[in-house]
């Protein structure tokens, strides 16, 4: 039995559902984002790029954030309406996450992906997690149609030469990535 660390009752304050899907069918590829207010606009651009290249596919978007203002409400509602899709906003309490280690490059929002994993456990057969700075330039049908074996995670492994990794580790001040890492912004 899988243990869930982030209980909904502790982290989830409210859900806003912009459901403008034409079909009532619930089957869709769930695509999730975890972002703070600094990347909400970029998140919208990422969603729009996916929708632009994947018309006709059943997609549902889930944004986990600790801030969602009036302008954001109008923008994401209009986006869902324009593309006849569903965008759900999960307002989370990030207070406990703010106590975890962060840097100037990685805010407490990097931990939202763990909340997302626990939230969808036993709720969705497959979830595509993307960082808000991901832009889609084509179809994602191979991801939509891909069938995973049970309890499988797929991720993008960033490639590079050893000296490139050493420079990245130095520039980010994180010695542990000198031997490489996987890109946690796409899994």
Regions inferred by a protein language model and the residue ranges of each:
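Glycosyltransferase catalytic domains, chiefly GT-A lineage
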Residues: 1-187
């Amino acid at each position: 039995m899988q243990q869930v660390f982030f209980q909904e009752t502790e982290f989830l304050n409210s859900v806003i559902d912009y459901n403008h899907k034409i079909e009532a069918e619930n089957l869709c590829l769930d695509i999730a984002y975890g972002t703070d207010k600094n990347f909400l606009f970029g998140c919208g651009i990422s969603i729009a790029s996916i929708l632009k290249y994947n018309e006709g596919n059943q997609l549902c978007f889930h944004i986990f954030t600790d801030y969602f203002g009036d302008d954001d409400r109008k923008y994401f509602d209009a986006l869902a309406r324009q593309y006849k899709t569903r965008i759900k906003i999960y307002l989370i309490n990030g207070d406990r996450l703010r106590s975890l280690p962060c840097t100037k490059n990685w805010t407490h929002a990097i931990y939202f992906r763990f909340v997302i994993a626990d939230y969808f456990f036993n709720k969705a057969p497959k979830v595509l997690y993307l960082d808000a700075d991901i832009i889609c330039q084509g179809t994602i049908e191979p991801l939509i149609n891909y069938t995973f074996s049970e309890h499988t995670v797929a991720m993008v492994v960033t490639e590079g030469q050893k000296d490139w990794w050493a420079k990245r580790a130095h520039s980010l001040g994180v010695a542990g990535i000198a031997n490489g890492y996987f890109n946690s912004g796409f899994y």
